[in-house]
Design a protein with these regions (language model features):
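Helix-to-loop junctions at the C-terminal end of transmembrane segments
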Residues: 29-43, 128-129
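Helix-loop junctions at membrane interfaces in 12-TM secondary transporters
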Residues: 60-73
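Multi-pass alpha-helical transporter architecture, strongest
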Residues: 141-166
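Short amphipathic helix-loop junctions that connect adjacent transmembrane helices
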Residues: 1-16
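Loop-to-transmembrane helix entry/capping segments in MFS-fold secondary transporters
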Residues: 13-14, 96-109
Length: 166
């Protein structure tokens, strides 16, 4: 839906391409730095940062009236998927025995990169067609906030192995 978001701020295809490129580019350093981040921060904290950033990015897309906020939203992808993807790998490696790690990775990625996005893409498309891009972005922000609350609840008792709540 990035083309609709770019159109909303008066830009077009060129901005859409740049925003997507910046988003993808910022994930790489986050992934490379993840082992160092994880030495300092628990997976609980890292998952919470990711969840908060998902909400912030959706909110920035929703309230954006100029390309500047879209660039900011693209840069914070560092804290979103750039941390989320390696955090999932570490979580599975720490929590499952080696015989079940491939299944664990598969399940996480089917939910986070397959089934969930497929369902939400269909809903988002319907919302854009029936109510417009701003309504879709409002719903996305609300859904992201609900997801953030789920992450907070799910991680409230979680401690990394050997971690005393860092």
């Amino acid at each position: 839906y990035m083309i609709h978001i770019a159109d909303k701020v008066g830009a077009g295809e060129g901005l859409m391409g740049v925003i997507l490129a910046v988003s993808a580019f910022t994930e790489l350093p986050a992934m490379a730095l993840f082992p160092r981040m994880h030495r300092r921060l628990s997976l609980r904290t890292l998952f919470r940062v990711c969840a908060a950033t998902f909400v912030l990015k959706d909110l920035l897309f929703w309230v954006a009236r100029s390309p500047v906020l879209l660039y900011v939203a693209a840069v914070i992808q560092f804290f979103e998927f750039g941390i989320f993807l390696p955090a999932c790998v570490y979580y599975v490696a720490e929590r499952l025995d080696s015989a079940n790690q491939a299944k664990g990775q598969g399940l996480i990625h089917v939910c986070s990169n397959g089934l969930g996005p497929a369902v939400m893409t269909a809903i988002g498309g319907r919302l854009i067609d029936s109510a417009g891009i701003n309504t879709m972005l409002m719903v996305t922000t609300a859904a992201g906030f609900a997801g953030f609350l789920v992450v907070l609840a799910a991680t409230s008792r979680y401690l990394d192995k050997g971690d005393q709540g860092k």
